[in-house]
């Protein structure tokens, strides 16, 4: 299946405790159908001390299911993603709301 949401995309959270928050995708896990969004879905984890790292309670991002994310178009509005074949034969992503091509 083609990736509708990719690393570097600006997205908005549709459901859950972070509903309405926006951020940039910095990792996608296609096998799990989840993505990590910077500054969204933060959880606290207890980190054991190591020689290189200090121990304590740290905050880090937790993965969000792709169905709970929507891509933001150039105007900053959430949109669904479609695909079309470009003039040179490559598959490009398009915003369903405006029909504009999505860079990526």
From Swiss-Prot:
The UniProt record lists the keyword Ribonucleoprotein: yes
SMART domains the UniProt entry points to: KOW (SM00739)
Keyword rRNA-binding (UniProt): yes
**What GO terms describe the biological role, i.e. biological process, of this protein?**
translation
Which is one Gene Ontology cellular component term of this protein?
A: ribonucleoprotein complex
Which key words are in the record?
A: Ribonucleoprotein, Ribosomal protein, RNA-binding, rRNA-binding
Q: Name one GO molecular function term.
A: rRNA binding
Q: Which PANTHER family match?
A: MITOCHONDRIAL RIBOSOMAL PROTEIN L24
In UniProt terms, what function does this protein have?
One of two assembly initiator proteins, it binds directly to the 5'-end of the 23S rRNA, where it nucleates assembly of the 50S subunit. One of the proteins that surrounds the polypeptide exit tunnel on the outside of the subunit.
UniProt subunit comment? Part of the 50S ribosomal subunit.
Entry similarity comment: Belongs to the universal ribosomal protein uL24 family.
Q: What HAMAP family does the database record attribute to this sequence?
A: Ribosomal_uL24_B
Q: What is this protein called?
A: Large ribosomal subunit protein uL24
Lineage, top ranks = Bacteria, Pseudomonadati, Pseudomonadota, Alphaproteobacteria, Hyphomicrobiales
- Which gene does this sequence derive from? rplX
């Amino acid at each position: 299946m083609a990736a509708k949401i990719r690393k570097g995309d600006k997205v908005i959270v549709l459901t859950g405790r972070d509903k309405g928050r926006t951020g940039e995708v910095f990792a996608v896990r296609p096998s799990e159908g989840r993505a990590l969004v910077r500054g969204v879905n933060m959880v606290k984890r207890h980190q054991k001390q190591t020689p290189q790292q200090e121990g304590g309670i740290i905050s880090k991002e937790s993965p969000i299911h792709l169905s709970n994310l929507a891509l933001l178009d150039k105007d900053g509005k959430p949109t669904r993603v479609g695909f079309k074949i470009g003039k040179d034969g490559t598959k490009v992503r398009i915003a369903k709301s405006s029909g504009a091509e999505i860079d990526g």
